[in-house]
Regions:
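Surface-exposed, interaction-prone regions used to assemble/regulate multi-protein complexes
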Residues: 1-132
């Protein structure tokens, strides 16, 4: 019997965020599944990622990445009018500038979203295993 379980990874440092980035590399994201809630300072990203933790298995996992304490969000080369466009998440990068962190979500075709925050508080939470 396979031990299948859903993961929850919490990142509070740049090193932790690199683990989430590696887990979500090549994940598929619909524009309609990207939400920024400025009054709550939360940025949500629902995605379909490959189960990289199990090398014998290539199941997809429906997951959500939650970024908290986000002061602002900017996107480039993403047409937000067409909600059905499918993006491919390549990596999540971070660097510090003027006592604030800039978290950049890098997508294929030179598309990206930049989030600004004072603290790193990111959660990757699996919702459902696909192809069971």
């Amino acid at each position: 019997m396979d031990n299948k379980f859903l993961k929850k990874i919490i990142a509070q440092s740049p090193e932790d965020l690199q683990i989430i980035s590696a887990c979500c590399s090549e994940a598929k994201v619909k524009i309609s599944d990207i939400k920024y809630l400025p009054s709550n300072k939360i940025f949500l990203l629902s995605l379909l990622r490959i189960d990289r933790e199990d090398e014998n298995n290539k199941n997809s996992i429906k997951s959500v990445i939650k970024f908290e304490f986000i002061d602002s969000s900017k996107s480039k080369n993403i047409i937000q009018n067409n909600q059905n466009i499918l993006l491919e998440l390549l990596a999540i990068d971070i660097f510090k500038r003027n006592n604030k962190f800039e978290i950049t979500l890098l997508f294929s075709k030179n598309r990206f979203i930049t989030l600004k925050t004072e603290v790193i508080e990111v959660t990757l939470e699996d919702q459902k295993l696909e192809n069971d």
